[in-house]
Amino acid sequence: MGEGAISEGWRGGLARFLVLYAALYGAYGLLSPILPGFLAARGLSPGQIGTLLAAAGALRLVVGPLAGAFADRRRAARPVLAASVALTGLAVLAHLPGAGFWQLLGPALLYAAGTAAPPPLADALALAAARGGAVFQYGWVRAAGSAAFIAATGAAGWLIGSYGLAAALVASGVLFIAASGAALALPVRDGSAKAGGWLGRNFAELLRLPRFRRILFAGSLVIGAHALHDGFAMILWRGAGIGAGTAGLIWSGSVAAEVLVFLLAGPPLLARIGLPAGIAVAACAGALRWAVLACTTVIPLVAAAEALHGLSFALLHLACLGLIEATTPPELRATALALYGTVALGLSGVLATLASGALYGAFGASAFWAMTALSLAALPLVPGLRDR
């Protein structure tokens, strides 16, 4: 990309999107790893924590698509994003005085409602501002989010060690509120509201598009196959004698590969091979990754397999978002991304996670062969994603 295009990108809001994604995903990184521990410290039993997290997940599945449809209907993605993130920040801070299940139920559900919409709404705004890569690459801002998540996760450990669990919640709440301000500072692209109508019409219009349905299904299969890894990879490695520090480095390598693909490797690769082929590459990379984990715990092989996360997750995300942008009308973009992120990927992750526990309990590492099959199941959908 030439110097003039980069300058136009900064004028078009690249710097503001970088700030938004860094603040938003940094706030997630501060809170996500430690929230169950905080709930336990405030007197919740494991069963109550599971109930709370399950209720929060179910609420997100409802709120996310509705918020996306409302933002499209009212042409208000930017203010809806800002309001959602502000609500999230206040909900995080509202956890601080609570103790016990009933006192923390309200803040937890508010947090779930607030976090349902921001990622797809931010993506919709970033894709519109990027203009298909003519102004800037969407991957640049998403890489900033991933890098901020990693940094914030490390910072959370330092904050907790120095000041206690509550300090990480305060920092997360403040960052969410800062992200709300960053959302309001984005370039104004909100148009006139459409005439009122049933929000479900947005969903119906999108689900009538065959290519969009295939994108949802393919993305669900490849992302859903990550569930066993996310829940049990650390348990597998520690059980095989891999130390906590080494296991952490292996995991960090996978996230570093994600940042690399978002920032540098992904956009030129997709420009060369095409978006549908990108989904095929992601599916094959995922299948190879899970096959290696099914067969061995030899550290160099596991580390090499984990580097495939850049393809199995980041390349898939870039390809799916590019196809959604090419397939869906702009006035339904926030709804489309909310369906992709909240329902297709979120629901598939929940279902695959439920299955993963039983699979790992019955078969141990060999359960990863099921994830290999799940990834490869996306390949027959790829021809239907091409332009006709």
Segments from the language model and where they lie:
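Helix-to-loop junctions at the C-terminal end of transmembrane segments
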Residues: 62-76, 160-161, 261-274, 360
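Cytoplasmic helix-loop-helix junction between adjacent transmembrane helices
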Residues: 108-144
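Intracellular juxtamembrane helix-capping segments at the cytosolic ends
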Residues: 35, 116-131, 315-329
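Structural signature of the two symmetry-related core transmembrane helices
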Residues: 79-93, 173, 277-292
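Symmetry-related core transmembrane helices of the 12-TM Major Facilitator Superfamily/SLC fold
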Residues: 167-185, 366-384
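Juxtamembrane intracellular "pre-TM" segments in multi-pass secondary transporters
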Residues: 2-11, 183-221
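Hydrophobic core of transmembrane alpha-helices in multi-pass small-molecule transporters
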Residues: 22, 91, 95, 101-119, ...
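Helix-loop boundary and gating motifs at the non-cytosolic
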Residues: 7-57, 61, 211-250
